[in-house]
């Protein structure tokens, strides 16, 4: 049996916000499996911040490049070790060049991006420039991820201070709508366009947690089944773009807005700097919400 150490208990407490004894008990019951312990605490209703699971520190910037006809977009997360370097002009110039070249060459993975010439017909690559920047600045610089999106309609985008970036493909040429929806995605962080696109794995995991909590009520099985079904349906609306209230007009669902505009969201991509990292200093999604509401 795995020995449960104070360090393990401390880590679980930091990642969930649960009480010390609850963390220790969860680790004992899961034989030291940190992820299983987090799920156990969630089922018991003890975890306050399960989203902290599996986090690693990262600073940097999200950069976006859009084609002139607004039908193609490219987005990248370029990381540094500190926020100070993330604001450095040389770092920002490199990140912008990554987006520019990624869009021009139509790449969609990090390896292909690093192999691109830093300028057309140049013998020097983006990877060469990255290494040179590391030597100049003295910090590890990495291109963490990249993505591209295209549409015959329009690709909208939104950037919140370089911390959150969104690309959104709309099937009709309505740039204003696409930008508004991209801003919405930045603020609300939906998991999918529609409820039926939410991953089965996510739904089953949440359903298991709802069931565990419902069973604690001691109600009959048929009542518990209805309770869980209702909770799952509510959750699917909350995490799908079409089921959410539009950030610029909370009285209207995004799905209803799209119907009125005779438009369809084909896909969206959302990057946040250090995604998976719980920052104590600021919640940037909440900041987007505050900014949008203030501009109404």
From Swiss-Prot:
InterPro entries: EF-Ts_dimer_sf, Transl_elong_EFTs/EF1B, Transl_elong_EFTs/EF1B_dimer, Transl_elong_Ts_CS, UBA-like_sf. Keywords: Cytoplasm, Elongation factor, Protein biosynthesis. Disulfide bonds: none annotated. Residues 82-85 are annotated as: Involved in Mg(2+) ion dislocation from EF-Tu. It is found in: Cytoplasm. GO terms for molecular function: translation elongation factor activity. GO terms for cellular component: cytoplasm. Associates with the EF-Tu.GDP complex and induces the exchange of GDP to GTP. It remains bound to the aminoacyl-tRNA.EF-Tu.GTP complex up to the GTP hydrolysis stage on the ribosome. PANTHER family: ELONGATION FACTOR TS (PTHR11741), ELONGATION FACTOR TS, MITOCHONDRIAL (PTHR11741:SF0). NCBIfam families: tsf. Belongs to the EF-Ts family. This is Elongation factor Ts.
């Amino acid at each position: 049996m795995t020995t449960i150490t104070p360090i393990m208990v401390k880590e679980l407490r930091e990642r969930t916000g649960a009480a010390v004894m609850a963390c220790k008990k969860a680790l004992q019951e899961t034989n030291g499996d940190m992820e299983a312990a987090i799920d156990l605490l969630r089922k018991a209703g003890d975890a306050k911040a399960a989203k902290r699971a599996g986090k690693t520190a990262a600073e940097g910037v999200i950069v976006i490049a859009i084609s002139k006809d607004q039908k193609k977009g490219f987005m990248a997360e370029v990381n540094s070790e500190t926020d100070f370097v993330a604001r450095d002009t040389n770092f920002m110039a490199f990140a912008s060049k990554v987006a520019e070249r990624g869009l021009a060459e139509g790449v969609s993975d990090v390896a292909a991006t690093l192999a691109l010439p830093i300028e057309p017909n140049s013998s020097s690559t983006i990877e060469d420039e990255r290494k040179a920047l590391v030597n100049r600045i003295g910090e590890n610089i990495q291109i963490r991820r990249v993505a591209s999106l295209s549409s015959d309609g329009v690709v909208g985008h939104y950037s919140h201070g370089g911390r959150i970036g969104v690309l959104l493909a709309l099937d009709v040429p309505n740039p204003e709508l696409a930008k508004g929806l991209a801003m919405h995605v930045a603020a609300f962080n939906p998991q999918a366009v529609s409820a039926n696109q939410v991953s089965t794995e996510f739904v089953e995991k949440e359903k298991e947690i709802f069931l565990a909590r419902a069973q604690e009520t001691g109600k009959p099985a048929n009542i518990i089944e209805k309770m869980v079904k209702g909770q799952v349906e509510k959750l699917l609306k909350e995490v799908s773009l079409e089921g959410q209230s539009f950030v610029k007009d909370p009285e209207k669902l995004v799905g209803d807005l799209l119907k009125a505009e005779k438009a369809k969201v084909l896909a969206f991509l959302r990057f946040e700097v250090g995604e998976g990292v719980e920052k104590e200093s600021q919640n940037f999604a909440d900041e987007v919400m505050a900014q949008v509401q203030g501009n109404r």
